[in-house]
């Protein structure tokens, strides 16, 4: 009996193709190849890493800031006040999450991601 260990790194702009290819490992199993993932037997499947965050950051910050202003305007209107200028603003950290939240399924194993940022903007109110 022989044990061969190999890790394959694939960089692709077509993650759907990589996911489809990973689904064909059952053919290897039917030929008698034993696959392992760490300490457990069975294929671990591909890991999907999102690398385009820097391209999205400016638009996401602009959108978060615009939504903060809309919420502040509504708050001011409901309070019978007018919205003043920005008192303070902080950009939170960017978070990459799995699109589908499921117990035991990690973000990296899911091809589709959700990216979020929280911007905290404090406005002054005018009476």
Residue ranges and their predicted role:
Residues 1-127:
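Short, charged, surface-exposed interaction patches
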